[in-house]
């Protein structure tokens, strides 16, 4: 079936002017995730912030109770004992100057990046490469740390980094279409709770303004914010 026809069919029965309770929205999304692959379930949260102002930036990391259903490749910048610790914890790529050089040459063979504090003077050179990809290690989200084992296992076990985009939206994958409705609801509520806890001091008015869920190939379904935050 052509993509256009599939999406048109998937949109049938979805009232794009209506706000659905979260559980109903998830059910609708799962019913319409009919691709041959296991589609990712995504959530978009519109916030009442302007991230161009430093005091309205929203970012953080949350451990989803049911994981993401995705296996991340984790890269760690570390030396000596910490490098060995990273390997033992299951990191896919570990290095120091050698790994910095690879990344500078465009060879980024990982999805999540962790660094020990002593490596940051070196890793700082990679800002132009890792920054636009949202992969720059940051102590605020636990990716610059001496607890290499915890960071690697967290990344492998279902932690999700979130960051508000220019339009004031946070987007994140929260599981797969094969997950049960209950597990997806739990994951979305965990993400929403973390976003609320990360509310910046400069935020004014209604913080969580709109919420929508979708699958990789399916339509978006608008959600009643109150059912996500409850």
UniProtKB/Swiss-Prot annotation:
One of its GO terms (molecular function) is structural constituent of ribosome. This is Large ribosomal subunit protein uL1. Binds directly to 23S rRNA. The L1 stalk is quite mobile in the ribosome, and is involved in E site tRNA release. It comes from Bradyrhizobium sp. (strain ORS 278). InterPro entries: Ribosom_uL1_bac-type, Ribosomal_uL1, Ribosomal_uL1-like, Ribosomal_uL1/biogenesis, Ribosomal_uL1_3-a/b-sand, Ribosomal_uL1_CS. Belongs to the universal ribosomal protein uL1 family. The keyword tRNA-binding applies. Keywords: Repressor, Ribonucleoprotein, Ribosomal protein, RNA-binding, rRNA-binding, Translation regulation, tRNA-binding. Transmembrane segments: none annotated. The keyword rRNA-binding applies.
């Amino acid at each position: 079936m052509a993509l256009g026809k599939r999406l048109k069919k998937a949109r049938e029965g979805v009232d794009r002017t209506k706000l659905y309770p979260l559980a109903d929205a998830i059910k609708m999304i799962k019913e319409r995730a009919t691709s041959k692959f296991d589609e990712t379930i995504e959530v978009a949260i519109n916030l009442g912030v302007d991230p161009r102002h430093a005091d309205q930036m929203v970012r953080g990391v949350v451990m989803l109770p049911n994981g993401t259903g995705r296996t991340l490749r984790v890269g760690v910048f570390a030396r000596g004992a910490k490098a060995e610790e990273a390997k033992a914890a299951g990191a896919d790529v570990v290095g120091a100057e050698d790994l910095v050089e690879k990344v500078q040459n465009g060879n980024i063979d990982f999805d999540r990046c962790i660094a020990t504090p002593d490596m940051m003077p070196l890793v700082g050179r990679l800002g132009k490469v890792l920054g636009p990809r949202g992969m720059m290690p940051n102590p605020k989200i636990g990716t610059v740390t001496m607890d290499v084992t915890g960071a690697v296992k967290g990344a492998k076990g279902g932690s999700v980094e979130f960051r508000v985009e220019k339009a004031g939206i946070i987007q994140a994958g929260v599981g797969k279409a094969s997950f049960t409705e209950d597990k997806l609801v739990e994951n979305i509520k965990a993400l929403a709770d973390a976003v609320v806890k990360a509310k910046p001091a400069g935020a004014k008015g209604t913080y969580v303004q709109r919420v929508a869920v979708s699958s990789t190939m399916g339509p978006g379904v608008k959600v009643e914010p109150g059912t996500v935050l409850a």
